Amino acid sequence: MPGPPRNAMGWRRSLSRMIRVCHIIPALSEPSSTDYLERENHRMRNRILSFIASASLLAVAGTALAQEQVVNLYSARHYATDEALYSGFTQATGIKVNRVDADDAGIMARLKAEGSASPADVILLVDAARLYRGEADGLFLPIKSKALEDAIPANLRARPAADGGIAWFGLSTRARVIVYNKAKVNKDDVDTYEELGDPKNKGKICIRSGSHPYNLSLFGAVTEHLGEQKAEAWLKGVVANLARPPKGGDTDQIRAVAAGECDIAVTNSYYLARIMRSDKPEDKDVASKVAVVFPNQQSWGTHMNIAGGAVARYSKNQANAVKFLEYLASPTAQNYFANGNNEWPAAKGVVSENPALRAMTGGQPFKSETIPISAVGEHMPKVQQMLDRVGFK
């Protein structure tokens, strides 16, 4: 069992000295046995004994607080299943999870503002571009964990630092898919990302802002596959094929396809899965009118983005933080983590149990790209410059 913390031992030494003082006071007063001195001695002894009692309680409380095991989590995930996931970690380890919820941008701004005073131990973000930015800004602490390295494929985690430490790990994956109007579009005309920039699809495409991290990640992947020159020409073609200026989120694009505002849209797979799992009549109507393509099955495969985790740069509970990430990569936790947002598990050998995802893929495996997700982030500055040049808002 670990011994008491230094502050508790300091209290004990002070208490011993105070107790000795209590015994000395009467001896000093004996030569002068006036009532005044006796009353003063009595009051002083009572004060010291009262202080000793209070100090003893503080020492005990300090020891208890020092021994409490916690991990402080800043999370951009806000799903109903997460509470059960974190409770499972506490039950398995005895480590309490203190959680702060915010969006990715808010979390990163808070970490920068807090600096070394930040209480954060673990950071969960929901996009590869944001994880890369957090690493580049020095917000994460590279770690070495055999359990995480064995569980998470190399292409779904940060590149190793010089000492072999890894700044972040993917914990779930989502596909950037193409949705189309079944009544108006032939699947063969949208089965690759490249065809989004083909003149045959002029005036048909809906998409959210090009500068949104989900699109930046896709465009970074296309740049990795095609090279900068071809990627920029492709982006120019996509802009020429827009049915309307970019606006809204991914769900808005799917609904626009069903409503006939456009014929083709780009979305993360989980937005479509939510609609497919919904019991609302309006969502069932949308789902009946659209179909989905997992692009580039005959070439490099569908672009996969991630939600991932990292240990905070100034974590005060580093061992607990690593344990928490290792837990999230375990087979049991992986399905909880992934199903919370209709995603696929990132860990090797863990099979999704999500019915909407199985329906989306026809129950068959699909080819996903294998480029390092860290390479996507490395292209972000160049991609943003391309978007500015081609007028992709």
Spans of model-derived segments:
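Extracellular/periplasmic bilobal clamshell ligand-binding domains
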Residues: 353-393
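Mature extracytoplasmic/periplasmic domains
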Residues: 307-370
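Early extracytoplasmic/lumenal segment of secretory-pathway proteins
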Residues: 67-133, 393
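Short beta-strand->loop
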Residues: 74-77, 163-168, 180-182, 188, ...
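A structural signal for short loop-to-beta-strand junctions that line the ligand-binding cleft
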Residues: 118-123, 141-178, 194, 205-207
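Ligand-binding clamshell of periplasmic/extracellular solute-binding protein-like
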Residues: 100-110, 118-141, 146-152, 173, ...
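Ligand-binding pocket segment of bilobal, Venus flytrap-like solute-binding proteins
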Residues: 210, 214-217, 221-295
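Periplasmic solute-binding protein
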Residues: 131-139, 161-191, 219-220, 304-310
